[in-house]
Amino acid sequence: MRNKLIELVEASQLRTDFPEFRVGDNVRVHVRIREGGKERIQIFEGLVISKKESGTRETFTVRKISFGIGVNRTFPLHSPLISAIEVVRSNKVRRAKLYYMKNRAGKSARLKEIKR
């Protein structure tokens, strides 16, 4: 059983300004990057292959292919560094984790799109 004070503090940290997305969705994540004294927004677009944890510790992993090399990036969902998340496309999947997509390329890596 969790402490009520901890739950109260965590509830104030949760962000609700993001759209609902699932594993299998293609998303575009806008991340704030600080380089030197400047800050800019970098967009990372790819397939959500996993979602883990709950509450303030919730994370999701996005995979994309960049110049022929697969890149996985894990984001904390409630991080202040994430400025926006856009759902580009929703796909039909039957698994909670899509780690098998790491071994697929070309036509075998296709997923069936669903309308939401």
Swiss-Prot record:
Entry GO terms, CC: cytosolic large ribosomal subunit
Pfam annotation, one family: Ribosomal_L19
GO molecular function, one term: structural constituent of ribosome
Keyword Ribonucleoprotein: yes
UniProt-listed GO biological process terms: translation
Biological role: This protein is located at the 30S-50S ribosomal subunit interface and may play a role in the structure and function of the aminoacyl-tRNA binding site.
HAMAP family: Ribosomal_bL19
Protein name: Large ribosomal subunit protein bL19
Gene: rplS
